Amino acid sequence: MVMKKSKSKTNKPNKANKNKNKNYNNNTSEDVEQLDQLDINEQLDSLFENINNNNNNININIINNNIDIDINNNKNYIKIIEFKDLKKFNYLIPSDQTSICGFVKYLIALKNNGSREAAIIFEGIKNFERFKELYVKYFFIGGKENKNKNKWSKLRVDQIGEMFNHLGLALTCCDEVISFKGSLMSELISLACTISNNSLYKKYHEQIFVFLASYFKQERKNQECELYCITGLKYFPNNDNFHYIRAFIHFDQITSKQCYADCKSGLKINPNHLGLLFIKAGVLLDCRASTADPISQVLAHYVYINKAHYDHQCVPEVFFYIGMLSINELDKFQLAIKIYRYAVQLERVAIYPNSSRLRMGKNTLEQILLSHKVTWEMLSDPEDIEYHSPEKPPANTLLENKDKKQLDEKHNNKIKEQQQQQPETTTTTTNMDLNSNDCSNNEVLNNKNNSGSSSSSSSSSGSSSSCSGSGSSCSCSSCSSNIKINDEKPYKITLIEDIYFVFDENSEDLKLEQKIKDKIQQINRFQEKFYANIREFQKEEINKLLLILQNQKISRQQEEQLKKRQQQQQQMEEQKLLLEQLQLIQTTTSTTANTTIIPPPQQQQQQQQQQQQQQQQQQQQQQQQQEEEQQEEQQEGEQQLQEKQLQEQLQELQKQLQEEQLQQEVEEQEEEENEEKEKEEEVEEQEEEEEQPQQQEEEEEEEEEQQQQEKQEKQQAGQTIQELLKEEPLQMQQQYLQETNENQQLYNISCGDKTITYYSLLDEID
């Protein structure tokens, strides 16, 4: 089924009035009285206190008893509600449209629907604003978000726990308040998933599980939602929110059996939970409705949609409408009786104590059912009513309960008078089982006695009543309802490889359990092969890296040798050039010494130029040598870095291999231990099974032997007594008896006309 989710807008107060909180907790009367005593300004001060953010500037002003909301200077003047005795005030709210919608819903609820509902919405908004205040306090500095990636790790356990505690409480009161999305929500979800398995946050796990389950419910991620609901119920079985969320999912998936079971168990914890009541009514309609019964399908969807929207103004009309259609059009008295009981159940809830339409619809439905010969005992059978009254009923329903008792007494007296006035008509008041299809159990529904047919009805009173019609014209339970209430069947929750599976017992679903286990074993084998291939691949990569390192070392050595040879050759050439220059200088000096001819100025200039050129060449050579040395140093540094990186990679791969090997060894040891334990248990069970029949056989043999011995002893005793009677005279017998012990037990035996006393001779005979 698809649920149409309503979106509240600030510029349409009528729609905002319909979108109220979805989940109601039991608030005590003291909390409501305290909220009534508070001034509205004080409530708003506590709501938006100490919160600053520069993302959205939202100013709320009250001008001439009207509310003026200004979002980011758009000047959206909205007349929402008129108040008295309110002064002007301005607030800077760090939120998007959702907080304004929640605030407006709170004001509307406070004005129109009284303080109880406003208190619930107010609690949800207050907890949500407290969460945002803590978030701003921890992660916002000067209006800008701290971009540190490890910002969550800097917080203490109590700080994160307090944040999620307020967030979970806000969701349980009014989940529309935190229906925001974006990077913040993704961070919160990832953080909540990580700390949900951490024992340090055990104190806050309940609200964290509620928050995660509700988020996954909104995102339609049913497997994740059900997982957190199951784990939440495992550790916190008294939290009705987990039952409500699971019922919501199962109703959406059209799994009516599990949904009905969740509703029933949740209502045992909190019988006034409206969400569970609505879902249960929708499940009953949907389960009873066949494919050829479109009206019931429409009604089921109608109840479900109204449950989702929580349009409380339409609730009584929905139940009255369903009850009337079930009688007039569908002719299903059982369904009408069930709906009547739910109307009574809703009337007892504190939120509907003064609903005139609900009372009117219930009374008219009651009159119609009674006119169709449905007895008052059927309507008020306590065995079928699945309502568990609270320990302390609300104060404003006590008077109505007294009035109801008086009406019950008056109605019973009227029925007795009618029975006395009509003695000929026989009506049997049997308890109607809503789950049975037997026509004989519901004879009352077929007793439509007219004034002219009293004799026929009296003649048929001794036997089971026959059907008065067929199809929709018959009021019999077997003819009128092809639709059965699917009773709650137990379901089995099994944990297979850290995954929760839910199966219906006594059905074909249990066969899936073995198939799932086989598939998981296949997956484990595949994983083992996969990891083995990965290890081989890693080993090959390591060998390749080692070869690369060896080749690099060899190439470096060769390069160094070549460089050394080149340097030696350059030095030899330079030395040769220097020697040639010295020889030239010596020859020139010798010639100048022998001759006194003064060289012309041109030759001197040439010599000076040659010397300058030689000096420049030497400087250039020195610079080249320095540059080459620098390049060599850089290359050596780069090569060393590469070697370090490769060595680090090798170390990491080796560590990974070691860790995987250790994990494998641990897993193999655990598997071996588990297999040994299982084998030992199987052997013990077999031994016990084998020993039991052996023990039984031995006991039976011992009993048979004892019986045979007793028979033989009795026979021997009788024979010995007869022999003594034949052989010994009476005097000898009397003397023999006098000599025996008097304390021994005596027996009387009649032998013809004589009676003989004797004691047990078994010991002596043996």
From Swiss-Prot:
Residues 418-430, 441-478 have a biased composition (Low complexity). Transmembrane segments: none annotated. One of its GO terms (cellular component) is cytoskeleton. Residues 431-440 have a biased composition (Polar residues). It comes from the Eukaryota. Residues 1-21 have a biased composition (Basic residues). Residues 665-707 have a biased composition (Acidic residues). Residues 1-27, 413-478, 658-727 are annotated as: Disordered. InterPro entries: TPR-like_helical_dom_sf. This is Putative uncharacterized protein DDB_G0287113. It comes from Dictyostelium discoideum.
